[in-house]
Amino acid sequence: SYNIKEMKLIEMDDINRPRVDVWGVSDLDLFKEADNILKNKKDSSKPSFMIIQTAGNHRPYTIPDDNDGFITKSIKKESLTKAGFKSIEQFNAMRLLDHSIGKFFDLAEESSYYENTIFVLFGDHGTADPRAEHMGLEDYELKLRSYNVPLIIFSPKIIQNPQIINRASGLSDLMPTIAGLCKIPYINKTIGRDLLISDNNLAFLVNKKMNPTSYGVID
């Protein structure tokens, strides 16, 4: 927050909810706190930007007792491996994250901020397992899967024509894409581009998993 004077960091000690493990509060409680902050903004007409960073799908994969009805599942080790999971704990932690996101949107749909908000869901990195059926061996050997992350942009009123974009892209494209959706005038000095402008298909990527680090442009 040093470079952005109006940025406010909300840390674990600022949230009146219990710590569940080394990562702090549960993702579910984190989403509930975010919803509470958004609902109680002093000036609802002033635009705002919020980042919610989840951590529950990391070891030790804690399932909190207070989980709004989440039920763990037990499946065979063979099925876990084929799907790319390394343990039943990791599988259920991913399911809990999905459950928590769903609960957040349930809360958001009941709020005044819902229809005027652009929700952007993305991962910071992926993972690879050569035994997973949906992952090619090249994903594992070239570490490509580490850079294959989900990106979902959702807004009930602002995005009128939903679409699936199949062009190569990277996390550096998020800032100009979000600015474009918000119709904010800007000079793009980043290495990313607006994904909704189809005349630029080049994506800048960095592969730090290789030695030495490799840089490239993908069309």
Model-derived segments and their meaning:
Residues 1-219:
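Solvent-exposed soluble domains appended to multi-pass membrane proteins
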